[in-house]
């Protein structure tokens, strides 16, 4: 069969461009190791069908704990070992102190003016100071103790009302407790539209995380519309903005006393005093951070802790015995009575090791072209620290995949980012500023659920039949809701 000249030229052209796309250009630049890539999508095909944190971990085991990934048009460095985490988050902490701009941050976080996504600079430094001294200080977290105790007691009563031997949706109950605590901490009272607010936050969380088309092709604006992402986010933002505006208006009329300042009180005081350059949108973005980020991470941690304990009857028996001995039949739990219980805290630390709330942390972005340990890194390269892989590194953790709270008994490892083999809240300048609040919102709900009830799986299932499948979003949640049968 004859082939026309036009066809030959077209085929030759296609082959030429495929060759140019598939072959790496020869250059004197030192490049990080990476998997083989495809045109346009880069390395995305290696991650299709995987949980991102697990897929990236598997690639790192093959190509190295410091590797490069091309995610669509986004160039990214992936760190998957304590050694490289320490090197980059200390030596290169400032060069990688920025956050990449995202469609979600632009629309939901009021043009990236919240604490998590704000670009590195004076505004972010002031926000960080605000968190340390006002919003998330130990004193402020302590001031919300009575809220936590009251809402945890409400959950206990709800479980009892459902009846001994009747399956109870713990996923729903835990999320509700933490969401209500945080909304009361923010606004001083239960939100009239609490259910609507919670549903909006859940919508945001569903739209966040993973490798969305808008995140891997940030410059292709038409894809943001074509995928429906921009429309969905705009709809969520409009509902959220209206709700928060109403809450702020109500709060301005009946604000709390200086002694019992809510988070919103603090922000409005600073805004009105002009000692900090806050706009109305900035206030809303920060409040959303307090509520959205705190609810999802804490509720996921409590769920995973109970899930692991169900699958490990030895640990469940031990932590419940500790609680019951310490509390000695008390009707209601006070926070200070359980804060220093050794085994309860070991359970929480081990849960955070196996199930860090943000397994890929929040990505950072390089602020300038630089040389990293002999490798050339372009400006705006994304930095992904896979704490999921780091927390399970077999070089640092014996039986790394096993749930074993006792591994921390004689360990000086802390959660505060100083030990790079254990980074549940990240490390460096952009480490999560809400760790104290997050831990308080994990410890007390978990203690209440374990102290008052014995738990088993429905329908006589054995403990090892609990489904531990993950669902990836803003955080890694259980794919199926945690339905357990209480007895009391």
UniProtKB/Swiss-Prot annotation:
Co-factor(s): heme
Keyword Iron assigned to the entry: answer is yes
Annotated EC:
1.14.14.95
TM segment ranges: 7-23
Q: In which pathway does it act?
A: Secondary metabolite biosynthesis; terpenoid biosynthesis
Q: Which residues are glycosylated?
A: 169, 260, 379, 412
Q: CDD domains, from UniProt?
A: CYP71-like
Topological domains annotated Lumenal:
24-488
The region annotated as signal peptide is: none
Q: Member of which family?
A: Belongs to the cytochrome P450 family.
**Protein name per its UniProtKB record:** Germacrene A hydroxylase
The gene it comes from is GAO
